[in-house]
Amino acid sequence: MMIFITQLIYIIEGKEKVFDRFEAIAIPSILKYHGRLLLRVRPTENSFIETNIEKPYEIHLIEFNSEQDFENFKHDEERKKFLYLKDQSIRTSILIKGTKL
């Protein structure tokens, strides 16, 4: 069953370039695991109509053919070599898993 991952990403101030380096590695590896980046949004202040949480730096919407494909992506050896970039740049994130209704 196709799954969708929405991620709200909050980065450490001043670490934008480090985050971009991690994304340059992580995003292409999605394809290896039957996934697809559907949206990558860096919202501006005017993008929000209403908010009751901290505004994220980026929002990603990704689809994978299955839960197993997502798990395989998370354990990708090449991606794991660069997790230190993620740790250096991302303060926190919120991951939401769902399916198409």
Where are these regions (language model features)?
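Short S/T/G/P-rich N-terminal loop/turn motif that feeds into the first structured element of a domain
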Residues: 1-75, 97-101
